[in-house]
């Protein structure tokens, strides 16, 4: 109930009239089944005041960013922005914690004095012998994190956005960051036509944006246009996300994004033990990545 309440209050603060309209429709239906949870949503001094709070923040931030310009000079696809320099030490401390009676501060002092060889031994023992990607290390891996800035096509973003154990934020969908050209388009020699259509859509986006605003203009942007977003997740989630999203049946674009994340964890962060233990991250390339998955799905449908 509270989740719906919060969602409706945020929807009521949205700049798009369509979103606010659906908020009212949802409220009407939800009050038929959980009325007691939604008493405050449209009270002037409660829910409506809360929605105004969200709306005021959005408007103020929109004004502020205009002071700094709105064009980006970088087109880097994946950038590792932030990570723990001493991630492996933190993870070792957390790995030992539940097996001892010592305080965390005492364990920190112990780990700081260990040789690199001993640290590696403890980490490998904690990670264990992973026989498949579902064998993920324990909660000590949640002690450290990575933060990435990503520029990818909107379709890939929508797939990666589905992961919940992370902090993810994104910018407005636009035509300002270019677009991707699917490999199949190049293979059938349709690239010129593709680019022509995308450029025309880009011009239409600008026309709509100047007339109705950028929030409305987002509706016409195809999934192949790029969007910028940030993803921050802990090391344990990195095992799950990167190994799952680089599987052979994944889409080539989000596979590439996740492969680059893994490379940056290894080479930029220098977390060699952690990166190498993500042994089900697949850096291979495949033709018709999803064909086997589609064949398997077709077989299942045929059996019904």
Residue ranges and their predicted role:
Residues 1-304:
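A conserved ligand/cofactor-binding region detector
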């Amino acid at each position: 109930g509270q989740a719906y309440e919060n969602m409706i209050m945020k929807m009521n603060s949205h700049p798009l009239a369509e979103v606010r309209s659906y908020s009212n429709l949802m409220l009407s239906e939800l009050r038929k089944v959980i009325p007691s949870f939604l008493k405050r949503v449209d009270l002037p001094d409660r829910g409506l005041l809360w929605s105004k709070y969200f709306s005021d923040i959005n408007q103020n931030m929109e004004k502020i960013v205009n002071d700094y310009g709105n064009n980006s000079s970088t087109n880097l696809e994946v950038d590792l922005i932030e990570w723990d320099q001493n991630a492996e030490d933190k993870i070792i401390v957390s790995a030992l914690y539940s097996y001892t009676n010592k305080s965390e501060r005492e364990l920190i002092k112990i780990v700081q004095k260990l040789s690199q060889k001993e640290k590696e031994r403890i980490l490998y023992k904690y990670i264990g012998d992973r026989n498949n990607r579902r064998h993920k290390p324990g909660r000590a891996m949640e002690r450290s994190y990575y933060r990435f800035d990503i520029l990818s096509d909107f379709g890939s973003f929508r797939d990666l956005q589905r992961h919940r154990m992370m902090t993810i934020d994104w910018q407005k969908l636009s035509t300002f960051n270019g677009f991707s050209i699917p490999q199949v388009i190049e293979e059938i020699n349709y690239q010129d036509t593709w680019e022509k259509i995308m450029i025309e859509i880009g011009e239409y986006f600008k026309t709509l944006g100047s007339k109705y605003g950028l929030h409305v203009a987002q509706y016409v942007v195809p999934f192949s246009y790029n969007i910028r977003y940030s993803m921050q997740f802990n090391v344990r989630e990195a095992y799950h996300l990167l190994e799952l999203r680089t599987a052979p049946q994944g889409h080539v674009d989000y596979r590439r994004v996740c492969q680059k994340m893994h490379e940056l964890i290894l080479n930029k962060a220098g977390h060699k033990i952690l990166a190498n233990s993500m042994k089900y991250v697949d850096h291979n390339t495949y033709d018709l990545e999803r064909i086997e998955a589609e064949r398997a799905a077709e077989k299942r449908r045929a059996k019904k």
